[in-house]
Regions:
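Covalent nucleotidyltransferase core used to form phosphodiester bonds in nucleic acids
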Residues: 4, 39-43, 47-52
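Short helix-to-loop capping/linker segments positioned immediately adjacent to catalytic or ligand/cofactor-binding
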Residues: 3, 18-22, 104-109
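Short beta-strand segments
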Residues: 11-45, 59-63, 72-75
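Short, structured beta-strand-loop surface elements
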Residues: 46-124
Length: 125
């Protein structure tokens, strides 16, 4: 039996919806990898989604296309910010999943001494 975690972890893109202070949803299509019972996303530490997750970890996730068109119903989840070391592991996992596209992102991310961030996402049962 395929679980929502299986579907989301295998998706090419994940629609990660965070929420502003006033409750306004902010959907963002992102690459995703599965790590055990958690989904993981790599991002820049100054991204708006990081700021919103820092304030409240309440998010919704759904599989989507490259431009963010959902391919399924949203699932409630809790997001947490991971360490920079975890961000490096997430970036390596993205290379494994996305091949050349992932390598290009890793190359750009590792140029210079730019900080990295990762988000861990746990589905709410």
């Amino acid at each position: 039996m395929t679980t929502p975690l299986d579907v989301l972890g295998q998706a090419d893109y994940l629609l990660l919806t965070t929420f502003k202070k006033d409750g306004t949803p902010v959907p963002t299509p992102v690459w995703v990898v599965r790590h055990g019972d958690e989904l993981r996303v790599w991002t820049a530490p100054d991204a708006g989604k990081v700021k919103r997750i820092r304030r409240s970890g309440k998010v919704q996730v759904a599989p989507c296309g490259m431009r963010g068109k959902p391919h399924g119903s949203p699932v409630d989840a809790v997001a947490t910010l991971l360490s920079e070391e975890d961000a490096d592991q997430v970036l390596d996992a993205l290379v494994q999943k996305y091949g050349l596209r992932g390598r290009m992102v890793r190359w750009g991310a590792r140029r210079g001494d730019r900080p990295r961030a990762a988000i861990g996402i746990t589905l709410v049962s």
